[in-house]
């Protein structure tokens, strides 16, 4: 029972860490990355469709993304969707391809993005702590029903705290990496 609670908490904490890493991968840095356009939704014959289903996105150079749209008639719709996003990008058509140059980030914008990333990190830490609280509550319920001893309760809480500390350490490491990436010129 306790091992199931521990495993469940471990899996949920790992999901929190992965969700945070996925979230911050979408924050624009000075470098081009195809994941930057993952959140772009294009109107495809009246249906909102993710860009990655309609085109391939590759890195042309460190500051340019190249989009190869599968259906040529969608070029203007893709450009419009990118411009409408809050990424501050201006795509340009070049025949069948669309190129998206990434402008250099200003110091002010970098600091703003760091604040956003730190806010995301705090949200992820709260999620990890909520998982810890849920696991500890389940163990306390077992103790209350006299299914486990107080020693098992204490041991389980210590294990869950170690998992929490490890997950928060991973979050902090990912945050530090992203901050360093954002501050590079």
Swiss-Prot record:
Major place of residence: cytoplasm
Entry GO MF terms: ribosomal large subunit binding
Record GO biological process: cytoplasmic translational termination
Location within or outside the cell: Cytoplasm
Gene3D superfamilies per the UniProt record, alphabetical: 3.30.1360.40, Ribosome-recycling factor
A Pfam short name: RRF
Keywords, alphabetical: Cytoplasm, Protein biosynthesis
Domain of life of the source: Bacteria
Cellular component terms per the entry's GO annotation: cytosol
Methyltransferase among keywords: no
Keyword set includes Protein biosynthesis: yes
General function of this protein: Responsible for the release of ribosomes from messenger RNA at the termination of protein biosynthesis. May increase the efficiency of translation by recycling ribosomes from one round of translation to another.
Family note: Belongs to the RRF family.
Protein's name in the database: Ribosome-recycling factor
Source lineage: Bacteria, Pseudomonadati, Pseudomonadota, Gammaproteobacteria, Enterobacterales
């Amino acid at each position: 029972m306790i091992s199931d609670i521990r495993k469940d908490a471990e899996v949920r904490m790992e999901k929190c860490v992965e969700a945070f890493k996925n979230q911050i991968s979408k924050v624009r840095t000075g470098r081009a990355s195809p994941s930057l356009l993952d959140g772009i939704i294009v109107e495809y014959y009246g249906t909102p469709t993710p860009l990655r289903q309609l085109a391939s996105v590759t890195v042309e150079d460190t500051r340019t993304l190249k989009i190869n749209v599968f259906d040529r008639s969608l070029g203007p719709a893709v450009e419009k969707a990118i411009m409408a996003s809050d990424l501050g990008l201006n795509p340009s058509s070049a025949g069948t391809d669309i190129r998206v140059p990434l402008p250099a980030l200003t110091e002010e914008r970098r600091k703003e993005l760091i604040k956003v990333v730190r806010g995301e990190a705090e949200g992820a830490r709260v999620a990890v702590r909520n998982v810890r609280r849920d696991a500890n509550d389940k163990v306390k319920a077992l103790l209350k029903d006299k299914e486990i001893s107080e020693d098992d309760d204490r041991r389980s809480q210590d294990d869950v705290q170690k998992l929490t500390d490890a997950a928060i350490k991973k979050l902090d490491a990912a945050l530090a990496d992203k901050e360093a990436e954002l501050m590079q010129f």
